[in-house]
Amino acid sequence: MKIAIIDATGHAGSLILKEALDRHLDVTAIVRNPKKLTVAVPFIEKDLYDLTTEDLVPFDVVIDAFNAPAGKEDMHQTSLAHLSEILTNTSTRLLVVGGASSLFIDPEKTTRMIDQVPEDAPFYPTAFHMSQALVHLKDTKGLRWTYISPAAFFNPTGERTGKYQLDDDFLHKNAQGESVVNMADYAIALIDEVLADKHENEHVSVVSQ
């Protein structure tokens, strides 16, 4: 199995890359600046928006760990739209490092987390554009995708415990009543899904135990 990780030098991407390498998987980093890589790994030096179908079809799985910069949060939508377009009608799977804003908080599935976030909140632009990106992803035909949301608190510095809960598209809490997951444990869950391929064309979530 050949795996590509887009933005493999970011917070989530670097931990996903480490998890894949620790499992001795065949992984390639797709980065704009390979000098930021801290491990020896094959890489493609290219901007996400310049990627083509020909670049990605050699891979069985493409992991989208792209994180839009501040002030350009709409790139969460445009970047995923670009990847969806070039992977449509191919056999390559697209796994997306998503956000918690798209998770439902009521049994009727009428309210998502984003629907309760004040528009003047500092994180609203990111939350909004990530949730909208998923809306459009769900409408894409001929694409093998999985969107994996972290818990409400996506902890970049928490230790790797090796434990997590994989759930549906609702906001879930751990045994302590907290919606939190460490990025290192999220990386485990994502690579587990890469290998298992159990949730194609589904929105799932990860929370700590």
Spans of model-derived segments:
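Short, polar loop motifs at secondary-structure junctions
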Residues: 29-36, 152
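Short, hydrophobic beta-strand segments that form beta-sheet elements in well-ordered domains
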Residues: 24-32, 43
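Glycine-/Pro-rich loop/turn segments that contact NAD(P) or position catalytic residues
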Residues: 75-159
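Conserved beta-strand positions in the Rossmann-like core of class I SAM-dependent methyltransferases
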Residues: 4, 28, 146
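N-terminal Rossmann NAD(P)H-binding glycine-rich loop of SDR-like oxidoreductase domains
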Residues: 3-23
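C-terminal substrate-binding/catalytic lobe of Rossmann-fold NAD(P)-dependent oxidoreductases
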Residues: 131, 139-209
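NAD(P)H-binding glycine-rich loop region in Rossmannoid oxidoreductase-like domains
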Residues: 35-90
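Residues in the short beta-alpha loop(s) of Rossmann-like NAD(P)-binding domains
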Residues: 9, 33, 100
